[in-house]
Amino acid sequence: MYCSDPPHPLHLVASDKQQKDHKLILSWKKPTMDSDPLGVFPNSPKYHPYYSQTTEFGGVIDLGLSLRTIQHEIYHSSGQRYCSNEGYRRKWGYVKVTMDGLVVGRKVCVLDHGSYSTLAHQLEDMFGMQSVSGLRLFQMESEFCLVYRDEEGLWRNAGDVPWNEFIESVERLRITRRNDAVLPF
């Protein structure tokens, strides 16, 4: 059995009082053969969004839904914090990460991490398949290193400054081979 349209079109309407009370009421009108065909469409004057429905047009069901629950709230992930300046801190701390030899970069939220080690773990998950031995960032035997561009436009080695200072100044991240890591780029 295939799904079909409901037998009676449903129209959402809200009166002025309902707007003030933030309540949503679902009402419907059963169309008939002799009724105005425009009467079943939401743009019809009979179904203006502020038209007060009465029981003469059919039943009224109060679903008890608050319009406030339907409004979207701004979502902040657990590690994000509010920054009033600099365009919400460059879209909540997301920075672009590129790796030498790859065309496509990725974005990470540095505010979701509490240290260099958790950032390195996420970058290993994203880019670790590019090397047989993995990235192993911040380890002496690694063939890769992580550098970042700060707010002054200078490229620096990640890990040389405390974490809190790093997340305040990082604008871009780049994974390079150690032997190719000659600054600036």
Swiss-Prot record:
GO biological process, one term: response to auxin
Annotated motif EAR-like (transcriptional repression), positions: 63-67
Range of residues in the leader sequence: none
UniProt keyword list: Auxin signaling pathway, Nucleus, Repressor, Transcription, Transcription regulation
Pfam families the UniProt entry points to: AUX_IAA (PF02309)
GO (cellular component) term, any one: nucleus
Localization in the cell: Nucleus
InterPro entries cross-referenced by the UniProt entry: AUX/IAA_dom (IPR033389), AUX_IAA (IPR003311), PB1-like (IPR053793)
Domain notes: The N-terminal half of the protein contains two conserved domains I and II. Domain I includes a slightly degenerated ERF-associated amphiphilic repression (EAR) motif which seems to be involved in the activity of transcriptional repression. Domain II is required for the correct degradation of the protein through the SCF-mediated ubiquitin-proteasome pathway. Interactions between Aux/IAA proteins and auxin response factors (ARFs) occur through their C-terminal dimerization domains III and IV.
PANTHER family: AUXIN-RESPONSIVE PROTEIN IAA17 (PTHR31734), AUXIN-RESPONSIVE PROTEIN IAA34 (PTHR31734:SF255)
Assembly mode: Homodimers and heterodimers.
Name the record gives this protein: Auxin-responsive protein IAA34
Organism: Arabidopsis thaliana (Mouse-ear cress)
High-level lineage: Eukaryota, Viridiplantae, Streptophyta, Embryophyta, Tracheophyta
Gene designation per UniProt: IAA34
